[in-house]
Curated annotation (Swiss-Prot):
Active site, per annotation: D54 (nucleophile)
PANTHER family: PSEUDOURIDYLATE SYNTHASE, TRNA PSEUDOURIDINE SYNTHASE-LIKE 1
Pfam family for this entry, one: PseudoU_synth_1
GO MF, one example: RNA binding
Species assigned in the record: Bordetella pertussis (strain Tohama I / ATCC BAA-589 / NCTC 13251)
Organism domain of life: Bacteria
Positions that bind substrate: Y112
InterPro entries: PsdUridine_synth_cat_dom_sf (IPR020103), PsdUridine_synth_TruA (IPR001406), PsdUridine_synth_TruA_a/b_dom (IPR020097), PsdUridine_synth_TruA_C (IPR020095), TruA/RsuA/RluB/E/F_N (IPR020094)
Identification of the protein by name: tRNA pseudouridine synthase A
UniProt keyword Isomerase present: yes
Catalytic activity, EC: 5.4.99.12
Function: Formation of pseudouridine at positions 38, 39 and 40 in the anticodon stem and loop of transfer RNAs.
Length: 270
């Protein structure tokens, strides 16, 4: 039995999140069915992912692992599994890893990117792939509010009521807000994220950007540790799991899908 790691990308618009469900309309169900078909239909295949994305959330870089007796070249895994996947899900790479590697528990950090369209009307060509806010936004105020969120905190004010995490303390290493033409690009990196945490952070930052709350509100909200005082959960459309960081011992040089996500649109984004 050997352990294989796969790097995935997917458009989450048509899927009800990553995690398997009885109805089978999830990314995990599609991936495991494709793996079983590639393996010859010898039985179910179980996978573990780095980060469980919600309904409508995308991934430019998702990492999974599985244990298998199947021996194939790395490129055979990529092309063979992709032959059984729908167009919106793709295996980008495959490689053998040691038994010590765990897609979820070995990860040091996860990075999410949120693409927000600031046009007067909703972005038809980005439907399902970018969030939208038509009101004018005070970006410097949003950046000032974001600084209060950096570091290790109890993020109870930004977790959903369905969150199953054992504790709400997370370390937010990075929260950048970049203006690129009609887009705002939010980049958030943390050791791990709570359920709906990124979308709740974006929603709160927009409250500040729209002038509905002062900059100091963000720190007060963080200290309150009460989700009921926060902003509504923002739409999932523009949210992408973009990078996973692992210790050097596992030999992953660069697992940043954000480069691929943004590079084709450099001109459009400014």
């Amino acid at each position: 039995m050997s352990r294989i790691a796969l790097g995935l990308a997917y458009d989450g618009s048509a899927w009800q999140g990553w995690q398997t469900q009885p109805h089978g309309v999830t990314v995990q169900d599609q991936v495991e069915a494709a793996l079983a078909s590639f393996a010859g239909g010898g039985g179910p295949v179980a996978t573990v992912c780095a980060g469980r994305t919600d309904t409508g959330v995308h991934a430019a870089m998702q990492v999974i692992h599985l244990d298998t007796d199947l021996q194939r070249r790395d490129e055979s895994w990529v092309r063979g599994v992709n032959a059984f996947l729908p167009p919106s899900i793709v295996v980008q790479w495959a490689r053998p890893v040691s038994e010590a590697f765990h897609a979820r528990f070995s990860a040091r950090s996860r990075t999410y990117v949120y693409l927000l369209w600031r046009g007067r009307v909703r972005p038809a060509l980005w439907a399902g792939r970018a969030g939208w806010a038509f009101q004018p936004l005070d970006v410097p105020a949003m950046r000032a509010a974001a600084r209060a969120l950096l570091g290790e905190h109890d993020f109870s004010s930004f977790r959903s009521s369905q969150c199953q995490a054992r504790h709400p303390v997370r370390t937010l290493h990075r929260l950048d807000i970049d203006e690129r033409g009609a887009f705002l690009v939010f980049t958030l990196r943390a050791n791990a994220f709570l359920h709906h945490m990124v979308r709740n952070l974006i929603g709160a930052l927009l409250q500040v950007g729209q002038g509905r709350e002062p900059v100091a509100w963000m720190d007060a909200l963080l200290c309150a540790r009460d989700r009921r005082l926060g902003a509504p959960t923002f739409m999932p459309d523009g949210l992408y799991l973009s990078a996973i960081e692992y210790p050097a011992e596992f030999g992953f040089d660069e697992l940043d899908g954000g480069i691929t996500l943004l590079s084709p649109f450099t001109g459009a984004l400014g």
